[in-house]
């Protein structure tokens, strides 16, 4: 159940740019937003659910809570909100209010409760009494003071049960009659009403936060801080294109201090992804010293891809010229021992595979060479086509001459 409540709270807390969260109703005073939840849960679960709701707009940085009642008008307003969901426009379900006997001097939102418990408010703020009834004595709360009751209780708001009148059957509450409260055990299952402070509709870009936004002068996504702003965050200090640490110039993309900027940054001048070090930079890293196309060790010239020292295509040991792919010294395709080099190695000119000296395919003794043990060498005395072959078994010309003589 808690997981379901959390998901619902996340959805209802979504700010739509209004002064109240989605599906909340702003109070007549303009200070609060209410929403009735027709889910029967214990008091503590209802309280935790309301605390997950965040305010909207430029309202106070205060989370939601179970509804607290600070005036007779607010008492009647909450009652009418809940009653509006009933078929007969009356309150069908009892709802939790944000107070409990374990902390009797404060409402759930932190505001003080009345010193004498839930004493009646002045009758000056009450709705007019029903026709024919005497003036209202005040806020219609049960005579029992909840503060004097046993612990582990919390008040619920419910409709009054007026005397049965002809034609009403006891089902209708006459206009002007408000709800009553009753303290029940906190483990009971009741519906509830959440309250969250109302925000103010402020044009985007004038206040802190998201607009107060792009290119503005207050913290958030604006200039202080914001994208293109001048203080820490996504702005200049720090921000994209800014001048202090972060994604700006100090540090930032194209900035002048460490980070993704010039010091360090893409194309920057100090360590990182910039020139010192960075892509295309001049010191160690991915830049010139070292880096792609750089001049010191790494992926640059010393050593690096296309560099002048060890690396791919370089002139010193490694995958470059000394030794390396296509290099001048030992390595793959180099001019010294290595694959295709000019000294011992695969395809070299000295001992090795395909070289010009002993080795596979070379020009000196070895496999495929032009020296002894090669049967195709005309100077090889073991070649059967050599007329100077002393062995008659393998000297074909002599064998043919002897055969003609015998014939």
Swiss-Prot record:
Highest rank taxon of the organism: Eukaryota
Expression by tissue: Expressed specifically in the micromere/primary mesenchyme cells (PMC) lineage.
Entry protein name: 41 kDa spicule matrix protein
Comment block on domains: The repetitive domain may provide a calcite binding matrix.
Family: Belongs to the SM50 family.
Domain C-type lectin: 29-160
Biased composition, class Gly residues, residue ranges: 223-369
Subcellular location: Secreted
């Amino acid at each position: 159940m808690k997981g379901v409540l959390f998901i619902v709270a996340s959805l209802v807390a979504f700010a739509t740019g209004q002064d109240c969260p989605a599906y909340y109703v702003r109070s007549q005073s303009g200070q609060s937003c209410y929403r009735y939840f027709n889910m029967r849960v214990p008091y503590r679960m209802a309280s935790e659910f309301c605390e997950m709701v965040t305010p909207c707009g430029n309202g106070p940085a205060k989370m939601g809570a179970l509804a607290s009642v600070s005036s007779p008008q607010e008492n009647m307003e909450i009652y009418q909100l809940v009653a509006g969901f009933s078929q007969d426009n009356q309150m069908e379900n009892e709802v939790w209010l944000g107070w409990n006997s374990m902390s009797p001097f404060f409402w759930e939102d932190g505001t003080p409760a009345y010193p004498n418990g839930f004493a009646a408010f002045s009758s000056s703020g009450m709705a007019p009494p029903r026709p024919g009834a005497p003036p209202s004595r005040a806020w219609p709360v049960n005579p029992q003071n909840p503060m004097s009751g046993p612990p582990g209780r919390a008040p619920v708001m419910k409709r009054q049960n007026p005397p049965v009148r002809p034609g009403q059957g006891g089902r209708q509450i006459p206009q002007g009659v408000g709800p009553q409260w009753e303290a029940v055990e906190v483990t009971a299952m009741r519906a509830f009403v959440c309250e969250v402070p109302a925000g103010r509709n402020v044009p985007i870009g004038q206040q802190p936060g998201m607009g107060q936004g792009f290119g503005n002068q207050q913290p958030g996504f604006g200039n202080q801080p914001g994208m293109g702003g001048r203080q820490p965050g996504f702005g200049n200090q720090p921000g994209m294109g800014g001048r202090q640490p972060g994604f700006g110039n100090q540090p930032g993309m194209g900035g002048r201090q460490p980070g993704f900027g010039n010091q360090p940054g893409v194309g920057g001048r100090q360590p990182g992804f910039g020139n010192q070090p960075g892509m295309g930079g001049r010191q160690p890293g991915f830049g010139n010293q070292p880096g792609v196309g750089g001049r010191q060790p790494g992926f640059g010239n010393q050593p690096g891809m296309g560099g002048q020292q060890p690396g791919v295509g370089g002139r010193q040991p490694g995958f470059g010229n000394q030794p390396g792919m296509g290099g001048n010294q030992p390595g793959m395709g180099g001019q010294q021992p290595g694959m295709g080099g000019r000294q011992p190695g695969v395809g070299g000119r000295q001992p090795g595979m395909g070289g010009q000296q002993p080795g596979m395919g070379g020009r000196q003794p070895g496999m495929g060479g032009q020296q002894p043990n090669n049967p195709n060498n005309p100077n090889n005395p073991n070649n059967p086509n050599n007329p100077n072959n002393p062995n008659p078994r393998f000297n074909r010309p002599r064998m043919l001459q002897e055969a003609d003589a015998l014939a």
